[in-house]
Amino acid sequence: MLYNLLLSHIHNSHIANLFHYITFRSGLAIIITLSLSFITGPILIEFLRSLQKNGQPIRSDGPESHQTKVGTPTMGGIMIILSSCLSTLLLADLTNKYIWITLFGFISFGIIGFIDDYAKVTKNNHYGVRGKSKLLLQGIISFIICVLLEYLDKSPSHLLNVPFFKNLSLDLGYCYIVFAIFVIVGSSNAVNLTDGLDGLATVPIAFTAGSFALISYLVGNLIYSHYLQLTYIPNTGELTVLCAGLVGSCLGFLWFNAQPAEVFMGDTGSLSLGGVLGIISVITKHEIVLAIVGGLFVIETASVILQVYYFKATKGKRIFKMAPLHHHFEKHGWAESKVVIRFWIISVIFALIGLSSLKLR
């Protein structure tokens, strides 16, 4: 909005010239989202606390230390969604189709998460909306997004780029749509499973969003994409602004979500953030890189899948003391802060490996 207004009304000023640069607008997006989080955070937390008498329901079979979290309000993801969307609307090019498609998915997944959080709070249990119902809604939204991308792109690509290999890509044909839906839904739920400790998911999300800010910028730039031998996708550079806003809003949220958390992001935040990262990876054709950069989310999800299947196959035996994996280490006696910080370190390593794929091929 601000970007479009400046370009349409102020042509020959230094300010207008600065707004031509995606890097400048991205930096400004981080500052704005951080500022909004710091200003609105206390107000939103107090408002959520007044509406939620018991806060987010805490599982009775979880680590004993989690019982100290009773009464902590949830739905803090509203803060992240609002600040990210506002900064994007202010600073991104609103004539860009990818911005609107991504915002549509971001908000839609946030609504699903909000409904789930609302059900948990009102029923005072941790079950919320049925898993199959959530998956169905996520699948429908992801399908709509994929159809929009197919329709709006003049020559939609169904290629799956393989990182670390030069000019290696797989043509999935129309099966790519099914794959893209799997990526978006899978990413949304993987982040959701990881969000189980104070601050645990927030920083890895910021690392992943920051990585895709760089990827979006490079893929959307003809010179850089040619130099790095990446698939050039025009207009994806504007997603850098959105990704930068996600980084700032996550860091701002961490201020209140660090142990001991004053608020949880809830499914409102985790489903929307995971979903938007999946959407951006599909648009930029870096779906496999998302699995690398977000390797922590993949590991957490894999631990749940392995636990469930092993439990059923052995009729009651478990691989881990508790799944997802972060609870396993808590049950082993690790302090929550130690689990969180060590998982952050792992997340940094995955992000560096994923980003190295841009050059190593």
Curated annotation (Swiss-Prot):
How does it sit in the bilayer?
A: Multi-pass membrane protein
What is one cellular component GO term in this UniProt entry?
plasma membrane
Q: Where are the transmembrane segments?
A: 28-48, 74-94, 99-119, 133-153, 168-188, 203-223, 236-256, 263-283, 288-308, 338-358
Q: In which pathway does it act?
A: Cell wall biogenesis; peptidoglycan biosynthesis
- Domain of life, per UniProt, equals Bacteria
The alphabetical list of record keywords is: Cell cycle, Cell division, Cell inner membrane, Cell membrane, Cell shape, Cell wall biogenesis/degradation, Magnesium, Membrane, Metal-binding, Peptidoglycan synthesis, Transferase, Transmembrane, Transmembrane helix
Pfam families for the chain: Glycos_transf_4
User: What is a GO molecular function of this protein?
Assistant: metal ion binding
Q: Which InterPro entries match?
A: Glycosyl_transferase_4 (IPR000715), PNAcMuramoyl-5peptid_Trfase (IPR003524), PNAcMuramoyl-5peptid_Trfase_CS (IPR018480)
Subcellular location, in the record's words? Answer: Cell inner membrane
Q: Which cofactor does it need?
A: Mg(2+)
- Could you say which EC number(s) this protein's record lists? 2.7.8.13
GO biological process terms, alphabetically, are:
cell division; cell wall organization; peptidoglycan biosynthetic process; regulation of cell shape
Q: Does the keyword Manganese apply?
A: no
Decide whether keyword Iron is in the record.
no
Q: Which reaction does it catalyse?
A: UDP-N-acetyl-alpha-D-muramoyl-L-alanyl-gamma-D-glutamyl-meso-2,6-diaminopimeloyl-D-alanyl-D-alanine + di-trans,octa-cis-undecaprenyl phosphate = di-trans,octa-cis-undecaprenyl diphospho-N-acetyl-alpha-D-muramoyl-L-alanyl-D-glutamyl-meso-2,6-diaminopimeloyl-D-alanyl-D-alanine + UMP
Q: HAMAP family from the xrefs?
A: MraY (MF_00038)
Q: What job does this protein perform?
A: Catalyzes the initial step of the lipid cycle reactions in the biosynthesis of the cell wall peptidoglycan: transfers peptidoglycan precursor phospho-MurNAc-pentapeptide from UDP-MurNAc-pentapeptide onto the lipid carrier undecaprenyl phosphate, yielding undecaprenyl-pyrophosphoryl-MurNAc-pentapeptide, known as lipid I.
Family classification: Belongs to the glycosyltransferase 4 family. MraY subfamily.
Q: What protein name does the entry list?
A: Phospho-N-acetylmuramoyl-pentapeptide-transferase
Lineage of producing organism = Bacteria, Pseudomonadati, Pseudomonadota, Alphaproteobacteria, Rickettsiales
